[in-house]
């Protein structure tokens, strides 16, 4: 009887551990259960936000994989109607401050996420390591949740973006590139995002000498953050560029249709 009880206990532990692995994800990427290819509730982002600038990194080759990502058939961006409406309010807000929104990614089909997973499993493919994860061994990308099996982007109300300065005609200097894998991308790196106070605390940087960002670069991140939060988006605690609509319409659905102009 003791042996049988022990076997049942071990089986239960394995099930729990397996579930933890399968749901590895960032804080805004809850478990989703319903796949669909229905794009009827989506809009082309630039139709809703005509002042936005697009630089769809996963359509090109300058990204952490180094090739075009599966599912990105055209260099466009799609969002749910609700997220696009809120983003228009963000755009109007930052335009009044002299900035435009620059979009790196929005809706991401599940096949794009699957592409990331295959890439992460190939530890020999480190082509883009010098540009996006020079301080990390590729083997930690799964354990540290830089790459996960599911993404909030597949739900259609998440996007990655920065600010473009209309006076200088350049991106605002955020002190780090989009998709940089490391603590330097965290909103609380060198400051407190809740108060907007710059502290200069770079102790989490794994580099030697440690990387840092300036007070001005931290404030640039805060300008974007304040505008997004003011219009209904939630931030992610590991990426300064990543936001999800708080009241997203499809919290339990992930979409599979490709990224291309909607008809």
State what each model feature region is.
Residues 25-106, 110-238, 248-263:
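Extracytoplasmic cell-surface/polysaccharide-interacting catalytic and binding patches
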Residues 243:
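Conserved metal-phosphate-binding beta-hairpin within the catalytic cores
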